A protein has these predicted regions:
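N-terminal maturation segment of proteins
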Residues: 1-178
Length: 178
């Protein structure tokens, strides 16, 4: 299951959804899907060399650190310099990238949180479905259901996965699964 391009294209193809639903973008869902696909890349064995693994872990660390930085700025009142120092000391980002990122977090409160929180939500509802469905769980059906929603608020995703579980993990109507 590829990332943003695939998710966005499938959202646009969902003719059963109203136009505004096909074209709306919720950061938690969209960015969460992007990070989730990086996570499943690990399951699929995409990161084969130590350099690929290091790159993945480096980006994962950056996504975790920005949870702290955004909260530090907007809840604890950190100065720009405190945020820069924290991000620079805990990631592999260049000085230019650190400054650009901190300015983005300052000007767009909470947006940086959406990435990791979205990923964790998708992973959590997947684990819930895997546990509830046991051997009936089918990863393709799960991904089909998630992507058929378009971009939705995370509580809506969770409600749909609860329905997927209640339906016994059937997947999408009209789709023939091998």
């Amino acid at each position: 299951a590829p990332g943003h391009s695939f998710q966005g294209a499938l959202a646009l193809e969902q003719q059963a959804l109203p136009k505004f639903r096909r074209q709306t973008y919720f950061s938690g869902f969209g960015e969460g899907w992007g990070l989730y696909t990086e996570y499943i890349g690990e399951e699929m064995g995409i990161y084969r060399t130590p350099y690929e693994r290091f790159g993945k872990l480096s980006y994962e660390m950056w996504r975790a650190v920005r949870l702290v930085v955004d909260t530090g700025i907007h809840h604890y009142g950190w100065s720009r310099q405190q945020a820069v120092d924290y991000l620079a000391s805990r990631t592999a980002l260049s000085t230019r990238e650190v400054n650009t990122e901190v300015d983005r977090y300052i000007s767009w409160p909470g947006q940086a949180l959406a990435y990791k929180l979205g990923e964790l939500t998708i992973r959590r509802v997947r684990a819930k479905a895997e546990q509830a469905l046991g051997p009936k769980f089918d990863i393709r059906k799960f991904h089909d259901v998630v992507l058929s929603l378009g971009s939705v608020p995370l509580p809506t995703l969770e409600e749909r996965i609860d329905a997927f579980i209640a339906d016994g993990g059937q997947g999408l109507p009209g789709v023939a699964y091998p």
